[in-house]
Structures are given as C-alpha cells and as structure tokens.
Amino acid sequence: MDINEQIFYKAELLTKGMRASDVAKSLLFSEFPDFFTKGIMHSLNVRFSETNCNVSIADDFAHESPYLLDVKDGQFFITDGQKSFPVSFFGALPHTGTVVDDFARLHSTGCVTIWPSSNCCYDKPNEKCKFCSIVKESETPLDADVLSEAIKKLFELSKDNMLNFSGGTYKNPDAMADYWIDLVKKIRAFSPAKIAIEFAPPSDLQKIVKMKEAGVDVAIMNLEVANDDLRKKICPGKSKISYDHYYNAFNKAVEVFGWGQVSSVLIAGIQPKEDIMSECEKMAKIGVFPTVMPIRPLDNAPVDLNTRCDPDDLIEIATHLAKLLVKYNLDFKKQEGCTKCGGCSIENDCYRKELQNA
C-alpha cells in the first residue's frame, strides 16, 4: 500500500468506522478479551501499512460503514468488498490486579492512555460539548495515590511505555490541574517515563508552570472549534474559557514546555474547513502542534447522528496542515502522547508524504 492509499483508507475508516464479522468478533474475544472487559470494542486501535488507526466499530454510525473487519486463516483484514488489506492489533497490557486493568489501554506501541476522571464539570444540561460521549461513572477522579501505585505495578511488568492522560475536567480546570500536578509528582518518584496530559487551560497560568515542574513533558489543550461564536454553540460550557485565554495558555505552555511540545485538537466536520486551516497556521506559528480529528457521532454524544466529516475534506485539511508542520518545524515524532500516536487523525501521514515529495 503506497502513502496515498494509506491516507485515503485511514480517512475513510476514521470518518465511517467499520463493522465486524461474527467470525472476527469471536476471534477477537478469544485472543484479546481485554478489548471487551474494558469496553474497547467501541473502537479498535489497529495498525495497517505504516500507520496507526483508531476505528469506531460499535457506535451506531459505524453500522452503515462499507468497511468490514474479517478474518481468514487467522489473519485479520479490512475489506470494502473490492480491496482488502491486513491489520494487526496492539494487544493488551499485562494484568496487574490493580485499577489500571480497568482504565489503561494501549493506543499504539508503547503509548498507554489512562482516563482517571469520567466526571466533567461541563457534562450538564445545556453545557455539554456536542461531540463528547463521556459518561460519568464516578463522582471523583481515581485517587492519585491509588493510581500511581497501580502505574508503578504496571511498569514493573511492562517497561518502555509512555503515559498519555485525558478525561473529564473534574470541578473546574484549576482543580483538575492540581490533580495532575499531584499525580505526576507521585509517578516521578519511581519513573522517568514520558508523560503527556490533556487538560483545559486553568485560570491561573502558573499552574502550567507547576505542571512542568512536577514532571509533565507534553501539554495538550484542545480548542476544538476555531470560530468563537460557533464554539459557544458547540461547547456551551467549555466556551466560558475564552478564546484569548486559550492563546495566553498556549503561549505560556510553549514558553515552559518548548516549541512543538504543546498541541491542540481541532474537530473537522462541525465547522468550515477554511476556519480550521486558518487556525492551524495561527497555532503552528507560535509552536503549538495542531491536530485535526474528524467528528464521529459517537453513542452518548449530543451531536446529531447525521453529522459527518467528508473524508475528502479531512485529506485536504491535513495536506495543508502537513505543509505548515514542515514550514514551522513541528515534527510529530518529537512529541510524545497523542501527537506521536496519530491514530485519530491523518496529518502525520500527510507529513510523511510531504517529506517524501520534498
């Protein structure tokens, strides 16, 4: 598969999801039972050609997908009825007997993602982000002492991993920043592993400095929607954090973490592509790595099921973004976490193509 096909099929899978045959489901259950016990069958992290891809498989919108995960002679493959290509899985983390068995998962080789908080202060009537599918399972985040001890056990059994933390914003952005600072300090007592954290910009920007001092390596603050008026409609609660404050936080984070060690997600399919491309350059020129993820109408998200991202638009945006990444010296391989994984977007693949064509 050449790079153009890789980009095409990844854009298709990200925007349309895929179905799974009964045979494939059965074999997945026997080979990767953790996919089911952790609810990972809602999406699968797969690798094909030279890319990672997080594919929706159980959400309602994926039931109409032209793509099917199947298996033959023990080999998993994806087909649209005309072309087929093999895929592999990243497998499961070792069993620790701790809370990470329920919360941690491999998103790509060596990238462990953990959501300590399922409680978001914006998950309220008339405040929840329209694209968000978070479901509150606990009133508070996992206790930092309990989680850090669990991660220590995991690292004793599985070395050379980095950590990517995400999840709901508990109480408010400042309180959540304090939680991350406390947790990372505890992890740093036993591990030098790279740590990336997704968080909403705190009102006190000194907390970003304290996160770096605690041992965080990468800061991820997702703006999601470029146009401020549209952002207020799509993110009615989170948009109380002003657009200007996001950029104040971006500038502070780049100052503290360094060029290319800060990133932000923009969501394609819910806003004009021209707005996204313009915002990408505004971010890139100050050292923030833009990531463009397509909207996926996930179950439990308020977004209408018919809200989709055109895969051709996603490719156009990512091709433009790849040129910006080269122009502003932003290399995904130098930023740990979501950016390096690249499973939910295609700009890394387009960046590789841009370098090949240079």
Which role does the model predict for each range below?
Residues 161-163, 260-263, 335-336:
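Residue-level recognition of the N-termini of beta-strands and the immediately preceding loop/turn
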Residues 88-90, 123-127, 175-177:
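Short, conserved acidic/polar surface loops in the N-terminal third of protein domains
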Residues 120-121, 139, 169-173:
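Short acidic, S/G/P-rich loop/turn micro-motifs used as interaction or catalytic elements
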Residues 148, 153-156, 166-309, 316:
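Conserved AdoMet/S-adenosylmethionine-binding subsite of the radical SAM
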Residues 1-78, 252, 256, 277-358:
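Auxiliary Fe-S-binding modules of radical SAM enzymes
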Residues 134-147, 348-358:
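Iron-sulfur (Fe-S) cluster-binding segments and ferredoxin-like electron-carrier domains
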Residues 67, 76-110:
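Non-catalytic propeptide/linker segments at domain boundaries
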Residues 20-21, 25-52, 94-136, 152-162:
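N-terminal pre-triad scaffold of radical SAM enzymes
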